[in-house]
Amino acid sequence: FDDQRAWFCERVNENSGGLYWLAKSILHNDEDVKDAVQDSVLTAYEKLDTLRDEHSFKPWIMRILANTAYSMIRRSKPNTDIDSLAEELPAPQNEDREESMALWQAVRGLGESLRTVTVLFYYDDMPIKDISRALGITEGTVKARLSRARAKLRIAMSEQEETL
């Protein structure tokens, strides 16, 4: 029992950054993000016996988190404009601060579905297969969303360069 608890805690710690980014890309509000991550970790621990393969822990817990976050959105005010809340997403740290900020601003401007897969793929280095399982969508859908996101980001960044 203690070994299982220790193993679970290690996996959660290893994935804490990814859990945060996924929750933040869906919920945006820091308090909601904390609640979603906490609720998801508790749910995952309670349902640990449903994890079929320990190597699938990351997509499994990400899926639990995504479901929790989307449930929180459904329970929240129906008039909440989720895309406008994207302004609250923090910028990642990078050597080229100005370009990084411009890119992050463009990522924040993406719609929720494109932004979520972009954050998981590029900021959390999650493989397409794992994103697919975590979000409950096909790998083809993940690839299509990444392609659309890249196209939109290319346009946004070229417009950004023109204004400089």
Regions found by a protein language model. Give the residues of each.
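Σ70-family region 2.3-2.4 aromatic/basic alpha-helix that recognizes the −10 promoter
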Residues: 24, 41-45, 55-78
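DNA-recognition helix of helix-turn-helix
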Residues: 66, 70, 135-159
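Internal acidic/polar
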Residues: 71, 78-107, 127, 162-163
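A short, charge-rich alpha-helical start-of-domain segment used by transcription regulators
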Residues: 1-21, 37, 115
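C-terminal flanking helix
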Residues: 16, 20, 41, 111, ...
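A short pre-motif secondary-structure segment
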Residues: 117-121
